[in-house]
Regions:
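Structural motif
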Residues: 141-143
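Short, well-ordered loop/turn sites that connect or cap secondary structure elements
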Residues: 137-138
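C-terminal motif of bacterial Sec signal peptides marking the signal peptidase cleavage site
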Residues: 42-43
Length: 211
């Protein structure tokens, strides 16, 4: 399948087990090639302080790949969990920013790029790890910064799919009691949509990467 030899001796045992589980979850949705690339995931470490990195906006192909992983999370019955950043496996729990981080981490496998930080809140990504863009420039996999209608504070983040007939479609991880009966009608990673003028949208952006 691949002529290039891959060195995985440095991969920790626990990390290797994660990729075995990832393969069985995604085996009907991803190619074997992406699974093999996943073995390189742990090689993407946090940047060293003595090395100078170059920052760029995430290329479109990286953003689209991140969205594809968001789709897989949505199809894997992922539950919402504040602070969660579980890799894709059984009994997955993840919060809104954790979803974005993990999708981009998977999307960056076998590339020269890494995230600016390995753990970020929605507000941190808005202020420090993204380039703000007009709504008209949104592409699949870009970031939707969101919050309460009555506040300007970014407290939530989603990944953009498309805008069609004035409606913005996206994937996010959240808990919501829509009917007001005390039961969460939404609990986890789902596909959702809002009007493009909804006040819960605070800004739109591209993920910043470095290499």
């Amino acid at each position: 399948f691949m002529k290039k030899k891959m060195k995985i001796k440095g991969l920790k045992q626990n990390s290797f087990k994660k990729y075995i589980m990832l393969y069985f979850i995604f085996k009907n949705k991803l190619t074997l090639g992406l699974f093999v690339f996943g073995l390189l995931f742990m090689s993407c470490q946090n940047p060293q302080n003595n090395y100078k990195y170059t920052e760029i906006d995430a290329p479109e192909e990286i953003a689209e790949r991140a969205y594809r992983f968001a789709e897989l999370y949505a199809e894997s019955e992922t539950e919402y969990d504040l602070g969660g950043q579980d890799p894709a496996r059984t009994a997955i729990k993840i919060d809104c920013s954790g979803l974005i981080i993990m999708c981009y981490k998977y999307a960056l496998v076998d590339t020269k790029y890494i995230l600016l930080q390995s753990d970020m809140t929605a507000n941190y990504m808005y202020k420090n790890a993204s380039t703000i863009i007009p709504r008209a420039d949104l592409k699949k996999g870009n970031l939707l910064f969101m919050g309460e209608e009555t506040s300007d504070t970014v407290s939530h983040i989603a990944i953009f799919e498309k805008e069609e007939n004035g409606i913005i479609y996206f994937i996010d991880s959240t808990q919501k009691d829509i009917n007001g009966d005390g039961i969460n009608d939404i609990n986890g990673v789902t596909r959702r949509k809002y009007n493009n003028n909804d006040k819960r949208f605070k800004a739109f952006g591209k993920m910043r990467l470095m290499y």
